[in-house]
Swiss-Prot record:
Assembly mode: Homodimer. Heterodimerizes with BANF2. Interacts with ANKLE2/LEM4, leading to decreased phosphorylation by VRK1 and promoting dephosphorylation by protein phosphatase 2A (PP2A). Binds non-specifically to double-stranded DNA, and is found as a hexamer or dodecamer upon DNA binding. Binds to LEM domain-containing nuclear proteins such as LEMD3/MAN1, TMPO/LAP2 and EMD (emerin). Interacts with ANKLE1 (via LEM domain); the interaction may favor BANF1 dimerization. Interacts with CRX and LMNA (lamin-A). Binds linker histone H1.1 and core histones H3. Interacts with LEMD2 (via LEM domain).
Compartment annotation: Nucleus; Chromosome; Nucleus envelope; Cytoplasm
Keyword Acetylation: yes
Name of the gene encoding the protein in the UniProt record: Banf1
Protein name: Barrier-to-autointegration factor
Gene Ontology biological-process entries: chromatin organization; chromosome organization; DNA integration; mitotic nuclear membrane reassembly; negative regulation of cGAS/STING signaling pathway; negative regulation of innate immune response; negative regulation of protein ADP-ribosylation; negative regulation of type I interferon production
Domain of life of the source: Eukaryota
Principal localisation: nucleus
Function: Non-specific DNA-binding protein that plays key roles in mitotic nuclear reassembly, chromatin organization, DNA damage response, gene expression and intrinsic immunity against foreign DNA. Contains two non-specific double-stranded DNA (dsDNA)-binding sites which promote DNA cross-bridging. Plays a key role in nuclear membrane reformation at the end of mitosis by driving formation of a single nucleus in a spindle-independent manner.
Disulfide cysteine pairs (residue numbers): none
Length: 89
């Protein structure tokens, strides 16, 4: 699987205070929906990812239900967070 530049940029460094839109798969529309639901920073979405025990099906379903992410968007976001965790946790 090839990854986007956005994905590579995200996983290349600590998360810090990056906005939710910095996550691969999360564009302006999904980012706005997530922000409206309290997920304004990438680390808040990471928290949900960890609460769901890094389970791909559960996380992708949550992302779909929370902000309307499609299959590609949820797959990209999951892969981004999984790779970030492998590098930094």
């Amino acid at each position: 699987m090839t990854t986007s530049q956005k994905h590579r940029d995200f996983v290349a460094e600590p998360m810090g205070e990056k906005p939710v839109g910095s996550l691969a798969g999360i564009g302006d529309a999904l980012g706005k929906r997530l922000e409206e639901r309290g997920f304004d920073k990438a680390y808040v979405v990471l928290g949900q990812f960890l609460v769901l025990k890094k389970d791909e099906d559960l996380f992708r379903e949550w992302l779909k239900d929370t902000c309307g992410a499609n299959a590609k968007q949820s797959r990209d976001c999951f892969g981004c967070l999984r790779e970030w965790c492998d590098a930094f946790l």
